[in-house]
Amino acid sequence: DRSVSRGLGDVYKRQVQMGTNGPCYVERPAGYAHTAMNWPVEPESLNWGPRYIQERYGLPMFIAENGLSCTDKIYRDGKVHDVERIDFLARYLEKLSEGIQAGADVRGYFHWSLLDNYEWHSGYRERFGLVYVDYASGRRIPKDSAFWYGEVAATNGGSI
């Protein structure tokens, strides 16, 4: 709790239950939405998580490193069409807006990463960025999500 109260904690929604030997993981049903890294897609966590932090600690907060990995690629038109990322962000930001309207003092939101980068867990395999990086050449291509997110930022969420 102390690290959370200092703004250093992560809030994740995990499904656990009490077993005879203590907490145990609950398998999600087949078809449960997940990212390319097999992390659950649970937009509601950006509604209840900030509200919980607000109710418990009464502190302003920033949301950092929210995003997902996708199997991004350059299409024949030379662009990166990452509709999964746009859908993910729209769902999460809608829920964050609900949390703010319910009283969470969220001062800012930061997408996981501007650029595709080296992920400590999986190297260059996962792509989290709003901008595609061709690691061989260093070339950068803004993904569709970069343009979408730019519009969201310019309208303070009004375009979601």
Model region roles, listed by residue range:
Residues 1-12:
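Single conserved hydrophobic/aromatic residue that forms the stacking wall/gate
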Residues 6, 64, 112:
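A cross-family glycoside hydrolase active-site/sugar-binding cleft signature
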Residues 30-31, 68-69, 83:
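Extracellular glycan-modifying ectodomains
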Residues 71-81, 87-91, 95, 99, ...:
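Aromatic-rich peripheral "rim/lid" segments of glycoside hydrolase catalytic domains that contact
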Residues 43-50, 86-94:
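Short, hydrophobic/amphipathic alpha-helical packing segments
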Residues 34-70:
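C-terminal substrate/ligand-recognition segments
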Residues 14-36:
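A solvent-exposed, charged loop/short amphipathic helix patch at secondary-structure junctions
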